Amino acid sequence: MTPLNSFALVAYLRGPLADFVDNLRRRVTPGCTHRAHLTLLPPRPLTAGVEEAIAHCENVLHETEPFDVRAGVVSLFEASEVIKLSVDSGAKQLCGLHDKLNQGPLRHAEKFDYEPHITLAQDIPTEQLQDCLRQARDEWRKVEPAATFSLSICTFVQEVKCDCWSDLTTVQLGVRNGSLSPLTNGASSVITPRTAAGHTPTARR
């Protein structure tokens, strides 16, 4: 199968925050296997080669020191009915990083302005949406003390078929003389970059 010309850059979550997102998704949208993540670049086609796009990510991220991100509140993108977790601390840095990355070989006219967030659930039947939103808010109160994480590693991903993504390579922030680590066994179905401006790497809002 020929992979699609659709690429995104994400930061996978770890620890209690990732567990909260993954567990909620599995309950609200059974069958969903996408890993919890924060999108830095929503999905886009490439007009240049993959190597050139990766080199651009490397140049930008190696010049950026790791920083803390703190998740905020559970809310809703009304137009797309996507339940998301806002970003409080770190939002300004994420927006600045997005603007630097969205240049050169990765330049793309995105449908929505970039808004840092973590997608919790989407494609929910409208009649179930408010119940799911309440459930997400109730569960988030238990996890909120673990809302801060360090953004230090990003992953460049490609859509291999509709809504199925594979990791291509990773890069550490602040490693000026380092190199991206190719993933020889990229995991498919990793995410659905539909990030309403930022979850599955698709910007639906």
Region locations from a protein language model:
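Polymerase palm active-site segment centered on the conserved acidic dipeptide of motif C
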Residues: 145-151
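Short, basic/glycine-rich phosphate-binding loops at helix/coil junctions
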Residues: 75-82
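Portal/gating segments that form or line small-molecule/metal binding sites
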Residues: 71
